[in-house]
């Protein structure tokens, strides 16, 4: 097409160990979102490949990879707005076909770990603050017990204390 592309990432290589937490940090425009988009399969690299457990994600199949192996929590939370917080988290299990006898209690415990009260869990999503909605989105990812959870600005709408609480919850879950 004659247009020259800007290189955002050049010869980037990352390896991650199970049970560890990593942060992609950098200045605005440094490639953080691009890195997450590539790792999630939302974008395809111009060169090279993205491996997950030693297999190219293109060969795994992007639908299978995104449905079974990873969860993505971006700045837009993709919550179901006609449900309350608890129903949103339980729906993530239903969509994945995960059956649990203790589904309600399990999802409620995750939401409570992330700082939502039982009353807040019963509230319509639109009645929750941006930070509370963010915690619901994170709870949806945690509930599915994915091998890899990718978060972009996962603490961006939270104050310093709640941000630290979220990071500590991720650390607890990783251990």
Give the positions of each predicted feature.
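Catalytic Walker B motif of ABC-type/P-loop ATPase nucleotide-binding domains
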Residues: 149-152
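Conserved ABC ATPase "signature" region
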Residues: 101-119
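Helix-to-loop junction immediately C-terminal to a conserved catalytic motif
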Residues: 40
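Conserved ABC ATPase signature
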Residues: 124-128, 132-134
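The feature captures the beta-strand-to-loop junction immediately N-terminal to the Walker
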Residues: 25-27
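ABC ATPase NBD coupling module
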Residues: 57-71
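Conserved ABC transporter NBD signature motif
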Residues: 48-56
């Amino acid at each position: 097409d004659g247009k020259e592309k800007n290189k955002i990432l050049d010869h980037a290589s990352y390896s991650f160990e199970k049970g560890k937490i990593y942060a992609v940090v950098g200045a605005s425009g440094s490639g953080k979102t691009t890195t997450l988009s590539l790792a999630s399969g939302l974008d395809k690299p111009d060169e090279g490949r993205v491996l997950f457990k030693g297999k190219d994600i293109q060969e795994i199949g992007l639908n299978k990879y995104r449905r079974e192996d990873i969860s993505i929590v971006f700045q837009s939370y993709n919550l179901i707005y006609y449900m309350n917080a608890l129903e949103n988290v339980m729906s993530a299990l239903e969509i994945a076909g995960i059956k649990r006898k203790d589904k309600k209690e399990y999802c409620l415990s995750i939401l409570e770990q992330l700082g939502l009260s039982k009353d807040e869990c019963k509230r319509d999503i639109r009645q929750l603050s941006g930070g509370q909605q963010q915690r619901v989105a994170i709870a949806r990812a945690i509930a599915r017990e994915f091998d890899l959870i990718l978060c972009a600005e996962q603490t961006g709408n939270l104050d310093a204390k709640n941000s630290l609480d979220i990071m500590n919850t991720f650390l607890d879950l990783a251990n």
